[in-house]
Amino acid sequence: MAEGLTPTLSGEELARYVPQLKDICTFKTTQLMNIDSTNMLPKHWLQIARCIKDAYDDFDAFIVLHGTDTMAYTAAALSYLIQNSPKPIVLTGSQQPMTGAFTDAKLNLYQAALFACDDNSYDVNVVFGGSVMCGTRACKQKTMSYNAFTSINYPLIAMIRANKIIRHSSCNQKSQEHRSALQLALSTPHAPMASECSNYKTAQEGAHSCVRFYERLNDRVMCLRLTPGLKPNIFDALTRDYDALILETFGIGGIPNSHQHNFAAALKDWIEQGKTLVLTTQVAEEGLDLGVYEVGQAFAHNEGVLRGADMTTEALLAKTMWVLGQAHTQDEIKRLFYTPINHDRVQE
């Protein structure tokens, strides 16, 4: 029986396979971990964010090489742990090993570096298969194809073709606005800090004055997909280990309300225990609207329910962990949850 693929090469070894990198940048590699991305945990997200924070003053951009299976989760998590970064933080990986005869790894790494070196790049993004996606919008949709990642409910930031970065028009406008805001920050040496960020990085005079780093996550968050026949009493088994539940509803926001499988009482009890309830849809595109059908209307105006709108499940999981890591009251939880971060939600 053939052995399955496992991570083997270090970052430095991977870079040697793409000698063209030296033509566009000088770089240093750091080996934080060498694990299959299936084994990634929230503590690893914090470790990556901390590494970037420690090196932030010394580099112009950061590239995170990551396995594809959980890369969207890590990209979303870094979007919340490192906010408003004027320096690009780019995640990439590959469907085939770097040593493969027809690998996509070389081109993905080169294009990630190309995007990271561009003056108009900032914040957390995923570069994969010639597409650039917001860290909060990337989602792995294919298991084998080289164009495995899709930007969900938000346009691509850019495409990379023939070594040229072709930016989406609306995203290019946002880039110009971001640079203008950054120039304003540069001219204001004592810009106010965000009060909710207790671990804000004290910035030097310069471009770092608007970046915010966070170092807390609450990983007691469960994501549960509704399926036909699921019993409402499942929530009783979750109360001990979880502080928040992300419930993936049917369609545009359907939650069973039949006599045998009525979820209303179970979800009401969950909220009354002081736990957080987030409703989203298990359909990837176009988002949630609880007001459309009767099976969702009971929750449409419930103040105890957080609505995922058009966010990805990966972003919802990471954001809920981040929110619960910072907030101490229900009002704070709601305020942070509904605050758009790195284009994570636009539908209301």
Question: What do these predicted regions represent?
Answer:
Residues 1-185, 189, 197-348:
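Active-site histidine-anchored catalytic micro-motif
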